[in-house]
């Protein structure tokens, strides 16, 4: 009998494996598609030509590198969202309004508010860019796919 007791004592206790709760259907703000939302701000309408303007892209890429890469990376999630594919998720107006007045957007636009929460309250700094500069960055974003 003692031998049987030893075997029983040496047996590993049964571990109850908890099943993971199914993940909710909530889509992260950075992945959400809101093309009908123009955001809050002075940009009401942006006309995009069917072709990419390479001069604008060059200027936009330079502006992005200088003003945005401390928080945004085009190849990964960082302090702020990755702008790659942004044109498939946000309207041109929303993007420009976010670039031009991130404070107003995070105060009044629900998607921008949700992004602020998703990125742990890291507010986007206002770079005090002109509309023309924001439009150049937008053109650069059109090339990020």
Regions found by a protein language model. Give the residues of each.
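Inter-heme linker and motif-flanking segments adjacent to c-type heme-binding CXXCH motifs
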Residues: 143-145
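The canonical Cys-X-X-Cys-His
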Residues: 60, 64-75, 95, 124, ...
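Gly/Gly-Pro-rich "capping" loops immediately C-terminal to redox-active cysteine motifs
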Residues: 57, 73-101
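Short, low-complexity, disordered segments immediately C-terminal to signal peptides
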Residues: 2-18
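Electrostatic cytochrome c docking/interface patches
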Residues: 14-63
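Axial heme c-ligation environment in periplasmic c-type cytochrome domains
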Residues: 79-86, 104-133
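Sequence context of c-type cytochrome heme-c attachment sites
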Residues: 44, 73, 114-115
């Amino acid at each position: 009998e003692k031998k049987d007791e030893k075997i029983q004592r040496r047996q590993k206790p049964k571990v109850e494996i908890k099943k993971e709760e199914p993940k909710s259907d909530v889509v992260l703000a950075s992945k959400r598609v809101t093309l009908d939302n123009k955001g809050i701000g002075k940009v009401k309408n942006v006309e995009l030509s069917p072709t990419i303007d390479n001069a604008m892209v060059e200027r936009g890429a330079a502006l992005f590198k200088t003003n945005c890469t401390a928080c945004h990376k085009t190849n990964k999630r960082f302090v702020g969202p990755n702008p790659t594919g942004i044109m498939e998720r946000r309207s041109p107006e929303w993007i420009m309004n976010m670039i031009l007045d991130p404070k107003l957007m995070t105060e009044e636009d629900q998607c921008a508010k949700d992004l602020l929460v998703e990125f742990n309250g890291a507010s986007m700094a206002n770079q005090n860019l002109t509309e023309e500069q924001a439009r150049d960055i937008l053109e650069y974003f059109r090339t990020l796919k």
